[in-house]
Amino acid sequence: MAESKSTSWADEVASPTIEKNEGNPLEEAQLDGATEPLGGGTLQDGQYEVEVKLSDIQGDETSPLYSVETFEQLGIDASILKGLYAMNFKKPSKIQEKALPLLLRNPPTNMIAQSQSGTGKTAAFVITILSRLDFSKPTTPQALCLAPSRELARQIEGVIRSIGQFVDGLTVQAAIPGAVERNAKVNAMVVVGTPGTVMDLIKRRSIDASQMKILCLDEADNMLDQQGLGDQCMRVKSMIRVEQILLFSATFPDEVYGFAQDFSPRANEIKLKRDELTVSGIKQMFMDCPNEVGKYEILVKLYGLMTIGSSIIFVKRRDTASNIAERLTKEGHKVAAVHGAFEGSERDQVLEDFRQGKAKVLITTNVLARGIDVQSVSMVINYDVPMKGRSDSEPDPETYLHRIGRTGRFGRVGVSISFVFDRKSYDALNQIANHYNIDLIKLNQDDWDETEEIVKKVIKSSRAGTNLQS
């Protein structure tokens, strides 16, 4: 972490974190294709290298289809291309250049793909799903996409509908809690859902899984790493026979990667180096709070900066989220909270209100840490440094990366501010910084004019890259 101008116990802690070179904007960005209600914008396509590991040692990396520069080179159906162009896609991002030729080739092959947040992973697997469908069977489920939360499942459903808006006969249905009535059938070609609900629907024969062709897991590391979700994903996989299994995520911890390889055997693999996983458009900062109580006082001081755009505050506990929302509301601030204790319909409404700007600050737990795209989010606050497990025994760098990835998306810049208040939280954040080889800028709580100037300069700056409009 960078040196501080103010004095505190943390100033005495030696930090090995390497100072990063500032002022290196993203090289290019393109529209990601998400419709405006979904928070669409531009893709991150900065200076990083995509590493490809072919499952087939006969694979020819010199083949013209090994990497492409235009969507037309892929032989994608004209109706899908029309949807991409209508959503302002101009050319494949770096991850798409490498992934799509492998995803679309025949016979189908499995893939494990890792890339930064906002680089076009969703569009890559959506294009693949649409390209695998047999449109002579409009009421037969043929593609299944699993996500860890109802919010992400709904978002993926929306992206499929948007990219497939000109595909005649396309049917898509969400399989999330409360979306399918007890005795109803799921008669859609593409099913997007959460593992537990999908498992129950297949067991009840509400989903005919006999003709499934493709299975995709978004945020795959999260689902395979959690015992409950991992077991459910394995059960779902055992209930269907598919030609292609796709695993996508921004992170794949070493302890999960072996499980991913077992789940998606003989897969082509696409991934980034660890120190390339963070997005250069996110300016990562931290504040040394006097104590646990002082975190809230500093949060209140930051409120004016949080509402320049929209902001998400991440906490560990549900009661903390509710308490902060209640206190801020009583002080006259327009905020919203959402966490796992909310009913599904409530969660949907809160997120929709946040997308529409009815509330500019959202307090949440890790339920929204992954995959959720809201274009207006300019700041993320880690009120609690992410830790692993109930005992908080060690820092959780993967969750940190996913949390801050809610801002700085689509080629824009954003700010993340993490709160520390004791040696444990400071050391945890420092370990996360070292894990990704990043530097964290310390904001001076004793000089709010300086702090506001630093943060405002980032939030009000132009996009991190330029649109490829020509």
UniProtKB/Swiss-Prot annotation:
Report the SMART domains cross-referenced here. DEXDc (SM00487), HELICc (SM00490)
What GO cellular-component annotations does this UniProt entry give?
Answer: cellular bud tip; cytoplasmic stress granule; nuclear membrane; nuclear pore cytoplasmic filaments
Reading the lineage from the top rank, the first entry is Eukaryota
Q: Which reaction does it catalyse?
A: ATP + H2O = ADP + phosphate + H(+)
Q: How does it sit in the membrane?
A: Peripheral membrane protein
UniProt cross-references to PROSITE patterns, sorted A to Z: HELICASE_ATP_BIND_1, HELICASE_CTER, Q_MOTIF
Free-text domain note = The Q motif is unique to and characteristic of the DEAD box family of RNA helicases and controls ATP binding and hydrolysis.
Give the multimer and partner information: Associates with the nuclear pore complex.
> What is this protein identified as?
ATP-dependent RNA helicase dbp5
Print the organism lineage.
Eukaryota, Fungi, Dikarya, Ascomycota, Pezizomycotina
